[in-house]
Structure formats: C-alpha cells, structure tokens
C-alpha cells in the first residue's frame, strides 16, 4: 500500500471505507494524500520559482505550525480537495493509475501489435509523474510495430500540471496531428 493510500486508511474517520455509515469524512487523511500527490504534479523549478524558501506571512497562514509558503499552499490545496473529493474514489482512481501497465502481460512492443490508429505522444520535460523517458518507450514500441507515431516533448515548468498551463503549446500540436 502506498503512502498516499495509507494516509487515508489510517485516518480515524475512514472506518475501513465505511465512513458514510458514520456520517464522517476522512478529511485529514484525504488532505495529506492530496498534499503528497500534489508535490509530484509540480516541478522543482516551478516550486522554487513560486515559493523558494520564503516564509509565510502570518495574516494568510492556513493554521499554526506553518512556516513556509509551500506548506501553506499545500495545506490550502489539501483542504480544498478534501472538501470536494470522495476518499474511496481517490483510492480507487490512484490505485488504477498506479497499477496500469500497458506491457505487463506481453511486453509493451507486443501489446501495441493490434493498434491501427496513429499515435501522438506528448510529454513535458519537467513531468515527474510521467517523465519523457516513458513517452520515448511508447514511441519506440509504436515504431517497432510500424505504427505512424509522433513524439513531442515540450518545455513547461509546471511539472505534470504543465498541460493545464501551456495549452497553447500542445493544442497546436494536437490540431496539426488530428488534421494530418
């Protein structure tokens, strides 16, 4: 079990996933899980540029014990998420993402043999969650199966979240790919 899931399951309000029966929500665990996950969505460069080692001003602190801006930001994001997302759904969704492996049963190259469509693989240099090397593996498997594929790595300083901020960069690539 990963740290993210464990933080939810260890919350006193989780009740083995039956928290709705007790009219509670495992907010602390869900908040911690999201804070941990959120770190992997951002890049080191983005976090350094946005927060550095700056101290949080006392007027806008989320709660006591917070010293740095990054802590305050993660607390805010965790609180926001715990108010709007179901803990069991988060566990299932992240477990599905963690366990997905296109080449698990037969290898990536063989798993691509039945693909008839052309492929566009887009990545960002700063993405820790799906680093550019994974996209290259996908394109190599496609090429070994004579699949028409394009692989593009874009600059973006927001890590995995770069696709949310640099839509102009990849929307042109997607449009060109679809119309070709």
Predicted regions, residues:
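Short beta-strand/loop motif that positions the catalytic acidic residue
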Residues: 115, 121-123
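Conserved alpha/beta-hydrolase "acid-adjacent" motif
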Residues: 128-137
């Amino acid at each position: 079990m990963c740290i993210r899931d464990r933080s939810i399951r260890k919350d006193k309000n989780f009740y083995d996933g039956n928290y709705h029966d007790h009219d509670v929500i495992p907010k602390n665990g869900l908040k911690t899980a999201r804070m941990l996950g959120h770190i992997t969505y951002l890049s080191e460069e983005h976090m350094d540029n946005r927060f550095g080692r700056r101290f949080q001003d006392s007027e806008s602190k989320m709660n006591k014990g917070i010293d740095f801006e990054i802590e305050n930001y993660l607390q805010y994001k965790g609180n926001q998420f715990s108010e709007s997302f179901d803990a069991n759904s988060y566990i299932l969704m992240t477990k599905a993402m963690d366990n997905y492996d296109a080449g698990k049963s037969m290898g990536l190259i063989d798993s691509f043999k039945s693909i008839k469509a052309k492929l566009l693989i887009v990545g960002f240099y700063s993405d820790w969650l799906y680093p550019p090397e994974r996209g290259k593996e996908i394109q190599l498997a496609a090429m070994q199966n004579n699949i028409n594929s394009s692989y593009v790595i874009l600059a973006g300083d927001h890590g995995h979240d770069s696709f949310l901020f640099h839509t102009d960069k990849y929307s042109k690539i997607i449009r060109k790919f679809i119309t070709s």
